[in-house]
């Protein structure tokens, strides 16, 4: 079965990354940690841990833009483990309003994890499965 991305007439996505709230907030540009022809990387304005970064593609090319962002996020996460003594990291995306997406331009979160950043790590076994409350346990 071939996977396709259906485009809706009432597509909620922005036309350009420059239309997103982070592009209009001067503070966001003060927090840029990397920029090249493909991606802007900056510190999240509402970080859940120290080092929480957003990877924002400059072009909207469906799967390609997100693939590039995941690759960058993975590389930065590995560097964080090696250089900043992070224990681990989560990489994630909220795709669509029902998934919690609030900025309607594709972007990837990379969240560093450290010992003690959650009360009982064994209780949250399953990681991202817990985005649906009480359904992540197995």
For the regions a language model picked out, list residue spans one by one.
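HIT superfamily nucleotide-processing domains
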Residues: 1-138
């Amino acid at each position: 079965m071939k996977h396709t991305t259906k485009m809706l007439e009432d597509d909620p996505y922005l036309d350009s990354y420059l239309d997103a709230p982070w592009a209009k907030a001067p503070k966001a540009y003060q927090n840029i940690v990397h920029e090249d022809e493909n991606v802007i990387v900056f510190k999240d304005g509402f970080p859940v841990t120290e080092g929480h970064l957003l990877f924002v593609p400059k072009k909207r090319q469906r799967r390609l833009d997100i693939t590039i962002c995941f690759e960058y996020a993975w590389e930065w996460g590995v560097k964080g483990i090696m250089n900043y003594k992070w224990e681990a990291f989560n990489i994630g995306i909220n795709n669509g309003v029902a998934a919690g997406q609030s900025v309607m331009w594709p972007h990837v979160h990379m969240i560093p994890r450290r010992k003690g950043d959650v009360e009982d790590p064994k209780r949250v076994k399953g990681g991202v499965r817990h985005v649906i409350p009480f359904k992540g346990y197995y």
